[in-house]
Swiss-Prot record:
Biased composition, class Basic and acidic residues, residue ranges: 47-63, 160-196, 351-371, 382-395, 444-454, 470-499, 670-749, 762-784, 907-919
GO MF annotation terms: DNA binding
Primary location group: cytoplasm
Keyword Transcription regulation: yes
Phosphotyrosine PTM sites in chain numbering: Y218, Y283, Y381
Function: Death-promoting transcriptional repressor. May be involved in cyclin-D1/CCND1 mRNA stability through the SNARP complex which associates with both the 3'end of the CCND1 gene and its mRNA.
Skewed-composition ranges (Low complexity): 135-154, 750-761, 809-824
Sequence positions bearing Phosphoserine: 102, 104, 177, 181, 196, 198, 221, 258, 261, 263, 267, 284, 289, 296, 299, 314, 383, 387, 395, 420, 425, 448, 470, 494, 500, 510, 523, 529, 557, 562, 576, 646, 656, 658, 688, 759
Species this chain originates from: Mus musculus
Superkingdom: Eukaryota
Keyword Protein biosynthesis: no
Cross-link (Glycyl lysine isopeptide (Lys-Gly) (interchain with G-Cter in SUMO1)): K578, K830
Protein name: Bcl-2-associated transcription factor 1
Cell compartment(s), UniProt: Cytoplasm; Nucleus; Nucleus speckle; Nucleus, Nucleoplasm
């Protein structure tokens, strides 16, 4: 933005000649910048080249032709000249004989080779705007041409004819007027390549589109042949398009140079060098920059006089904004790039124009000029700011307009040559002084007012620029109307009256948002460029902007009012009736205390009001207290856990006395478990979702169910006998002692091994013994055997895997016979099983170790620990303890291999269990 700032400063310079000279120098610098670029752009490079990708990522940059190497460009360390040196372009490999790509696409051939990345705004200025015609020819050109619809306003046609008159010598301008009319009729149909025309259309669309008030500035910009925006239909079109078609045309004719100068730098027109000269210089970076384009857009209307320029800018903007919607679609993508720079430059330039114009008008008409210019500046600021805002809104318009602007610049350069007379005439007009300006501005204002009235825009209508382009258009029109009206009134009224009326009208027709935004922007702009007017934005129910004129005592008189209004604002904000608008105005307001040096009290008031506003608007406390909220969570978790208690359909439901007993036990145990959890850690209870607890609880449930189901399955009386509550109690500790389980398993294996080989009856006997033993050791074994007792199935001798220990599980799956482990688990009372005292941590937390449920664990693991006893009284497999001997014995007894069917069923059961566990 340095460039744009310098531009703005130059335009700020009071003397037009000065600004013209500056603009000229600036334009030269920009020319340097862009000349190479234009050259490089003559061949339209691939889109990627136009983008600033670092070379390494660009497709055909160097070695990466067609393929991006996974590694960054790795110099030349690997070939012959390993230094790689700068032999060719650094890589030593010249992919293409002409290495255009060594330069980043944005730099073009001219600039230093360092990959200058431009700021968004500078990139845009980079010449989307300057070269807008060229870029328009590129994909952008379509947008710019499509922007020809922007020249929808009749004025655009008028101006098109004017430009044709001036440009018909140029030929392109002729296209422009038809294109303008076309674009008016077919916004997107005409993508004619006439840069001037496209630019005019852009200007129109920008004017109507609210997007780029400054696009007309582009037109006016020295490069855009429309730099004499009058010819460049877009500026006048834009202004006339929305507000004062005739006015724009008149202004275009009168102010063609003026428009150039208005292309944000009045300097070009003021400098008085021929429009052509100014055209080139006008196409200076500042003018070409979107902001400058904005002024030139306005300048069609503005061009009439610097005085009118702001109003007409506003008008042009409003006209832009009305068309902005159409423009928006096209230019939206380009807008973003330019919006930042343009908004800044545009505001600065406008400020500069106003400063320049204000001194002129003030010098000639000090009486009226003081109040008038300040007011007008304020109005212009409002309109300009709003238009600038709308520019932001219609992001598309900007680029398209820029593109077209560049085209127009070229036409405009030609037109400028033809229009030098216009420049001189405009210069004469300016020299004629505020009189002529005021006349023109009055005329332009009246025209624009008439145009607005034709459009039935009411000043009182509150449309928020921020909200949407159409609203912004209406607003801008209203604003322009208001500003024009005020301008007319200014001549009639004393400056103070004018000011007051202006403020009233401005604020009446512009919504609080406009006011606040304008006020903010004004204050910001004034801070940047010292304008004589200072805004005291005091927000009452509706933000009011007061212009603080240093010479005028308005300031002091307004200060108390502003403070009271601040208080009102604070209260209103607290009530949060006015939301965004006032919130924005508050920010302006906060800036005010510093600007106005208001008391700390007012500042505090602002801050308090802000805090309240933010709190109410953005941090509304929920109706539910934290306690209630978390209580609800806890309740939900409890309900969830209770729900889970209910038998799950996918599980096999054993309907057997053991199952019923188990169920009752399960319910009691769960109650106990819940109580424990609640006592110990409500957090965990809240988190029944907590994985560990959930898993543990489920495991318990399963093991209990298994125990019960297994008990039922272990149909043999031995199991039932031993499964008396006593047994459960006995086994409970053991089951709970999953840590003991390993040992228990070993014992159970040994015992089970003896038991398993034995017939079911012997097994049952043994099981009873074992169960007694297991009172210390392994109900696993008992369960396993009890399972078998009912069915003396060979315990998968099939697996005589001696070393298998736990790992035996794989075969254990087939080993459905040894349901021992599951059986064991079943036997343990569930309450006992999970008694935290006994439960070893390893069991609880080790892989959610289902060592109790080893069956589940291993079944999950596909280890085939016969988990499936559920259906058909299958035997629970004893979890393979670690004793290979036991496995050996166990399987030995049954020399028979279990049926494949059983294996399959075991697998099925495993699957079921897995499902259960997952759930």
């Amino acid at each position: 933005m340095g460039r744009s700032n310098s531009r703005s400063h130059s335009s700020r310079s009071k003397s037009r000649s000065q600004s013209s000279s500056r603009s000229r120098s600036r334009s030269h610098s920009r020319k340097k910048r862009y000349s190479s670029r234009s050259r490089s752009r003559t061949y339209s490079r691939s889109r990627s080249r136009d983008r600033i990708y670092s070379r390494d990522y660009r497709r055909d940059y160097r070695n990466n032709r067609g393929m991006r190497r996974p590694y960054g460009y790795r110099g030349r360390g690997r070939g012959y000249y390993q230094g790689g040196g700068g032999r060719y372009h650094r890589g030593g490999y010249r992919p293409v004989w002409n290495r255009r790509h060594s330069r980043s696409p944005r730099r073009g051939r001219s600039r230093s080779r360092s990959p200058k990345r431009r700021s968004v705004s500078s990139q845009r200025s980079r010449s989307r705007s300057r070269r807008s015609y060229r870029s328009s020819r590129s994909p952008r050109s379509s947008s710019s041409r499509s922007s020809s619809p922007y020249s929808k306003s009749p004025v655009s046609k008028r101006r098109g004819s004017q430009e044709k008159q001036t440009k018909k010598a140029e030929g392109e301008p002729q296209e422009e007027s038809p294109l303008k009319s076309k674009s008016q009729e077919e916004p997107k149909d005409t993508f004619e390549h006439d840069p001037s025309e496209s630019i005019d259309e852009f200007n129109k669309s920008a004017t109507s589109g609210d997007i780029w008030p400054g696009l007309s500035a582009y037109d006016n910009s020295p490069r855009s042949p429309h730099s004499p925006s009058p010819i460049a239909t877009p500026p006048s079109q834009s202004s006339s398009c929305s507000d004062a078609p005739m006015l724009s045309t008149v202004h275009s004719a009168k102010n063609t140079p003026s428009q150039h100068s208005h292309s944000i730098q009045h300097s070009p027109e003021r400098s008085g060098s021929g429009s052509v000269g100014n055209g080139s210089s006008r196409y200076s970076p500042s003018q070409n920059s979107p902001i400058h384009h904005i002024p030139s857009r306005r300048s069609p209307a503005k061009t009439i006089t610097p005085q009118n320029a702001p109003r007409e800018e506003s008008r042009g903007r409003s006209s832009f904004y009305p068309e902005g919607d159409q423009e928006t679609a096209k230019t939206g993508k380009f807008l973003k790039r330019f919006t930042d720079e343009e908004s800044r430059v545009f505001l600065l330039d406008r400020g500069n124009i106003r400063d320049k114009e204000a001194p002129k008008e003030k010098g000639s008409e000090k009486g009226r000029a003081d109040g008038d210019w300040d007011d007008q500046e304020v109005l212009d600021y409002f309109s300009d700011k709003e238009s600038a805002k709308q520019k932001f809104h219609d992001s598309e318009g900007d680029d398209t307009e820029e593109t077209e602007d560049y085209r127009q610049f070229r036409k405009s350069v030609l037109a400028d040559q033809g229009k030098s007379f216009a420049t001189s005439s405009h210069r004469n007009t300016e020299e004629e002084g505020p009189k002529y300006k005021s006349k023109v501005s009055l005329k332009g204002n009246r025209e624009s007012d008439g145009f607005r009235e034709e459009k039935n825009y009411k000043l009182k209508e509150t449309a928020y620029i921020v909200e949407r382009p159409s609203t912004a258009k209406d607003k801008h029109k209203e604003e322009d109307k208001g500003s024009d009206r005020i301008t007319v009134k200014k001549e009639v009224q004393s400056p103070e009256q004018v000011k007051s009326e202006k403020l009233k009208e401005l604020f009446d027709y512009s919504p609080p948002l406009h006011k606040s935004l304008d006020a903010r922007e004004k204050s910001i702009f004034r801070e940047e460029s010292p304008l004589r007017i200072k805004m005291i934005a005091s927000d009452s129910h509706r933000p009011e902007v007061k212009l603080k004129m240093a010479p005028v005592p308005l300031d002091d008189s307004n200060r108390p009012a502003s403070l009271t209004k601040d208080r009102l604002l604070a209260s209103t904000l607290v009530h949060s009736v006015k939301k965004e608008q006032e919130f924005r105005s508050i920010f302006d307001h906060i800036k005010l205390p510093q600007a106005n040096k208001s008391t700390s009290e007012s500042f505090i008031q602002h801050i308090v009001s802000l805090v309240h506003h933010v709190k109410e608007q953005y941090f509304k406390s929920p109706a539910v207290t934290l306690n209630e909220r978390f209580t609800s969570y806890q309740k939900a978790t409890e309900e969830h856990s209770t729900r889970q208690k209910s038998p799950e359909i996918h599980r096999r439901i054993d309907i057997s006395p053991s199952a019923l007993r188990k169920h009752t036990r399960l319910a009691g145990e769960e109650r106990g478990f819940k109580e424990e959890i609640q006592k110990g850690d409500k957090k965990l209870r809240c988190d029944s979702a907590d994985l560990r607890h959930d898993i543990d609880r489920r495991r318990k449930e399963r093991s209990k169910e298994r125990g019960d189901s297994k008990g039922s399955r272990e149909s043999s009386g031995s199991r039932k006998q031993e499964k008396t509550p006593k047994d459960y109690k006995e086994y409970k500790p053991y089951k709970d002692d999953s840590k003991h389980k390993g040992r228990e398993r070993d014992h159970s294996r040994s015992s089970s091994s003896s038991a398993s080989p034995s017939s079911p009856s012997s097994r049952e006997e043994k099981e009873s013994k074992k169960e007694r033993e297991e009172e210390f050791k392994t109900h696993h074994e008992m369960k396993d055997y009890s399972g078998f007792a009912g069915v003396s199935r060979p315990r998968g001798t099939f697996f005589r895997i001696r070393g298998r220990g736990r790992a035996r599980g794989v075969f254990a799956g087939t080993n459905t016979g040894p349901n021992n482990s599951n059986t064991t688990f079943q036997k343990r009372p569930k309450e006992e099983e999970w008694d935290p005292e006994y439960t070893p941590k390893s069991k609880k937390y080790f892989l959610h170790d289902d060592r109790d449920d080893g069956v589940d664990y291993w079944a999950k693991r596909g280890r085939g620990r016969g988990t499936f006893q559920r259906g058909r009284g299958r035997f629970n497999f004893k979890k393979s303890g670690s004793s290979p001997k036991w496995t050996h014995d166990k399987y030995q007894g049954d020399g028979i291999v279990e049926d494949d069917e059983e294996t399959m069923e075991n697998n099925e059961e495993k699957k079921d269990r897995r499902k259960e566990e997952k759930e």
